[in-house]
Amino acid sequence: MITDMIKKTKGQIEAEISEAIIKFEKEYMGRGPLEAKAYLIEDIILIKLKNVLTPAELRLAESPDRKDGRELIKRLRITLLEQGRPLLEEAVEKIVGVEVKSLHTDISTVTGERVILFSLTAPPVVIQKPEKRGG
């Protein structure tokens, strides 16, 4: 159970999660995405990563046996993410102050995009940005 009260805006949480995912992809998977964007929706965090495939994976996905190649890439990437899952969950829990209930992922070998979805045990506490007042 996460007990520390985290006081961040929704935008801060989304930015920190995007940075943590990029760091994980670079350090654990060996290559970072071109772009990562996290979205906090109640008790769900959705991360969209662009351009995650390596040049070798792209060649494999475009080979004459591309169906087999694409399935191999998907299985490999899902297996690697599952092995690194404790690291990812720990990073997310530290940022949001809420436990991760489940993690789901998929990757497109056609577009090179990956989506990661975290389901949390509860919505994180989010502070509202103070409204700017006119002078």
Which residues does each PLM region occupy?
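Interaction-mediating elements
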Residues: 2-135
